Regions:
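Nucleotide/phosphate-binding catalytic cleft detector across ATP-hydrolyzing
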Residues: 3-5, 77-210, 215, 264-269, ...
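Local cysteine-cluster metal-coordination motifs and their immediate loop/turn environment
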Residues: 34-66, 73-74, 81-100
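Glycine-rich phosphate-binding loop of actin/hexokinase-like ATP-binding domains
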Residues: 211-215, 220-248, 311-325, 359, ...
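N-terminal phosphate-binding loop and adjacent alpha-helix
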Residues: 239-282, 407, 416-424, 518, ...
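Short glycine/threonine-rich loop-to-helix capping motif typified by GTGT followed
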Residues: 297-312, 387, 539, 550-569, ...
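Glycine-rich phosphate-binding/hydrolytic loop that grips phosphoryl groups
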Residues: 335-336, 348-363, 520-524, 574-611
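Catalytic phosphate/nucleotide-handling subdomain of diverse soluble enzymes
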Residues: 388, 393, 531, 535-602
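A contiguous, well-structured pocket-lining segment that forms one wall/lid of small-molecule binding clefts
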Residues: 470-537
């Protein structure tokens, strides 16, 4: 009987083999996952709360069963009784392994919180809000002139040129408000025809939120709807990550676990509601002042948010339940918000090209309509748009999670302590690197790694490492290691060769042969998707290459060009546009006219499905090469590929 069990941690993506009876805190520490534990694991500080996932997790190849961890202890039962918010959670120091597990470490339990970067650079947005405020002085009723309270209010609005209706849910509070304010009201009117909130007359600040629902990260931007000023922003890990690290894993979870779709929906709605509550608290405002929320996300995130099963999107022909712009009130989704807060979701384009891509398109629409422009959001499913001479084509390409550090032997998501930059001297093969959270390079005096070892390598780091290895001739053009260049830096892990990148004793960081293959497959898939669009539009160059998303913002243009992720690209044409989806969502929140702009623009986009394209395989094979390497392909060696589970 094997007493070693696989324990996988989210959101970091770290995996480790723990022994039967080990506490989850011990395993986390061995895996380099930093969980808060001031008492050292003696059950005294009560800070190491974690959540044990359940069901089949195909991404990790793990099936979680409630009996794979020891029973809830008396201490935990008492703490949960005292604070019901702990229900469903466990103390890592009190929970012992009895089988394979997937463990979610919530943000409040992380010693080094996940590095989340989806901040919006300052933008100059046009403002034409859907919400307008009107001051109304209601005339006192008499026996001779005694209209209803609602008629009185509507008449006052009509005098100001507004013909509106009043929402039924406001009627119960209208007369008490009229009496308490002596008939002096400020009224919020949506789309110039519907009263959605009433307040005592005065100066009121009305807010709106733009939300980017990423598969990994949720980003919120809150604006003053009058002047368009950004007043608050926040981001958080998408709590769905505990059900599957990538999109297809979450679809698989829904397919294999009864009620799985409801759990995914509840998780994301709950987190978004929490973020909006925090925003209102931070702004010291009431919920009825947050009246508009615009959301974007990929098709699977869209469907799950609305409680629509994503299963159809897990298999061809990837049929959407709905594509169009969608408006719903908070009460229709049973969200714990002001009932008439309107939640608006951008239109989807088709298949796996979603509302986030549509929003990114809106944010860059001027340049895309004037120049030959490639817009790429690199993620587990790359979304690609190409514009030329007024035509816009779009596709998605299954790059997998390697670019985000997953499926890499020492890979982690972007978290503090993760290697994000790598340089290798071509002559000495000396490695220099930077980690997230420290501005200094590893060979500089003020480098702070004496306090914290590198926890792994994230997506930008693995890209730079592989390019640097290829430039130094340590990887040949086919992607195989050239071990004869520096045999002392190579070792074996089973049947796989690995290169020592950072020597940290038993916590050393390696690049394995299968890691190179994972990046090779990812870059070939993305490159093939771009090539297909170039083929359709008879395009042989780009005026601009726009990298969207938080990951794109961290990529060095030189390394993107050298890795041949994008055909014919040169570093000077590559520009990071940051969280373009968040920028587009913000633009549509603040200017009602932008909504019609993107609704009409999306209808003209031609969607190409790579899965059915006969030339995809041809382009894919061509893109496998590492042209930056000076070493041509060596004698063929069979390379073991890590089994990818979908």
């Amino acid at each position: 009987m094997d007493d070693n069990y696989q324990v996988c941690f989210t959101p970091s993506g770290r995996q480790y083999k723990g022994e039967f009876g080990d506490t989850l805190l011990q395993v986390a520490q061995d895996a380099g996952v930093a969980i808060r534990s001031l008492c050292g694991g003696y059950g005294q500080c009560h800070q190491c709360w974690i959540e044990v996932s359940e069901g089949e997790h195909s991404k990790f190849g793990v099936k979680c069963d409630p009996e794979n961890v020891t029973a809830v202890t008396r201490l935990e039962k008492q703490l949960i009784a005292d604070n019901p918010t702990y229900k469903g959670k466990r103390l890592a120091c009190q929970s012992c392994i009895q089988g394979d597990l997937v463990i979610d470490v919530p943000e409040e339990s992380q010693e080094h919180k996940a590095y989340i970067s989806k901040k919006n650079a300052k933008q100059n947005y046009s403002v034409a809000s859907s919400i307008s405020l009107f001051d109304c002085n209601l005339e006192e009723s008499t026996l001779d002139e005694n209209p209803s309270a609602s008629e009185n209010l509507l008449a006052q609005l009509e005098k100001q040129g507004v013909k509106a209706s009043i929402d039924f849910n406001l009627l119960a509070s209208l007369q008490p408000l009229i009496h308490s304010s002596k008939g002096k009201l400020t009224v919020a009117v949506r789309d110039k025809n519907q009263i959605v909130a009433t307040y005592p007359q005065g100066k009121h600040q009305i807010f709106g939120g733009a939300i980017d629902i990423g598969s990994t990260t949720l980003a919120l931007y809150v604006y003053d709807l009058k002047d368009g000023k950004l007043v608050y922003e926040s981001s958080a890990m998408n709590p769905q990550i505990r059900f599957g690290e990538d999109l297809m894993s979450r679809v698989s979870y829904v397919m294999m676990n009864k009620g799985g779709d409801e759990k995914l929906t509840a998780a994301v709605r709950g987190k978004i509601t929490e973020m909006l509550h925090d925003a209102c608290e931070n702004l010291e405002t009431e919920w009825d002042k947050l009246l508009e929320v615009v959301l974007v996300g990929n098709p699977i995130m869209h469907h799950i948010f609305f409680g629509i099963s994503p299963v159809e999107l897990g298999q061809a022909p990837f049929t959407l339940s709905i594509r169009s712009w969608l408006d719903v009130d908070a009460k229709d989704l049973s969200l714990d918000l002001y009932p008439k807060t309107r939640l608006s979701f951008f239109p989807l384009i088709a298949g796996h090209v979603g509302a986030d891509t549509a929003a990114a398109y809106l944010s860059q629409i001027d340049i895309m309509h004037s120049k030959t422009t490639l817009l790429v959001d690199i993620g587990t499913n790359a979304e690609i748009m190409l514009s030329k001479e007024g035509k816009v084509y779009a596709t998605s390409s299954p790059t997998g999670p390697a670019f985000e550090g997953a499926e890499i032997s020492s890979g982690v998501r972007a978290t503090y302590g993760a290697i994000e930059r790598v340089r290798i001297d071509k002559e000495t093969l000396k490695v220099r690197f930077k980690v997230i959270g420290c501005d200094a390079w590893s060979d500089e005096p003020n480098f702070e790694l004496v306090k914290m070892k590198a926890v792994g390598i994230c997506g930008s780091g693995i890209i730079e490492a592989i390019v640097a290895l290829a430039e130094a001739g340590i990887i040949d053009q086919s992607g195989l290691f050239v071990e004869s260049v520096a045999p002392e830096l190579f070792s074996k892990k089973g049947n796989t060769s690995r290169f020592l990148l950072v020597d940290q004793g038993d916590k050393s960081i390696y690049i394995e042969q299968v890691d190179i293959r994972s990046i090779q497959l990812a870059k070939a898939a993305l490159s093939a998707g771009v090539s297909i669009l170039m083929d359709y539009l008879d395009c042989d160059h780009f005026d601009k290459i726009l990298l969207a998303g938080a990951f794109g913002a961290h990529l060095d243009a030189r390394y993107v060009a050298l890795l041949d992720i994008i055909p014919t690209s040169t570093a000077e044409k590559i520009v990071s546009v940051g969280n373009a989806a968040g920028i587009g969502a913000s633009a549509a929140l603040l200017d009602i006219n932008k909504r019609q702009t993107i609704i009409e623009a999306v209808e003209k986009v031609v969607k190409i499905e790579t899965a059915t394209e006969p030339r995809f395989q041809e382009f894919f094979v061509d893109a496998m090469k590492f042209s930056v390497s000076p070493v041509k392909q060596q004698a063929t060696k069979k390379v073991r590929r890590r089994k990818r589970v979908s």
